[in-house]
Amino acid sequence: VAAEMPISWPDEALKAQAIAAHSYALYCRDHAAEPASGWLSVDPVRRQGYLTDAVLRSYWGTAYEENYARLSALVDSVLTDVLYYDSAPAGASYFAISNGMTEASENVWGTALPYLVAVDSSTDLNADNYLYTVQFTAEQMQQTLTGLGLLPDPAAPASWFGEAALTTSGYVASLPVCGQSVTGPALRKALGLRSACFTVQYQEGSFLLTTKGYGHGVGLSQWGAKALAEQGQSAEEILAHYFPGTELRR
């Protein structure tokens, strides 16, 4: 939980994150091809999924003991809480910031799950760095596109990108790139973009890519959970909003 949300965020948001992470871990266990060889990955070096005690101490400094005690108490209070769908733990995925709507799972991972559908998360528009622009030189973009097996014409960089087709939630489903169709998630990964909700502009020899939100967009918006908690919603209410049709079991 400490790796996923700032300790300064509301109790109910932190509890919602803890329940989602627990449920997602159980879902991964139940759907692993080879459970004995591992079914969930974390990357402490990149601060993903898990933080070492040393890193937590460096983050929290003199507030370490107080913060750890608070977070431990919050996690302990929901330790046995799990989101279920159809009598099995739900794949309660989570991410940082949406574009204002969450994304349906089939548009990102190819598999539709009835509780991973588009829901409103318009409070995310107030998130820090909701809009974020990165710049690529034409040479950098050419190298990336070539790495995707595309053939960009060096003499006509303005023609490399066509008009994007969007999902219902407004993320890029696909777009023409150098005469071929590339999915939004694939281009996001190749370019290291914060989100698959992006626009592309070419001007004066450079490409400007502006994203809305941060993360894959499926499931619990962490910023949205913070906003709903600040509005007085409980962890259970937050999870019911982002994972419709699920049941919280204790």
Which residues fall in each region the model found?
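Conserved, single-site charged/polar hotspot
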Residues: 1-250
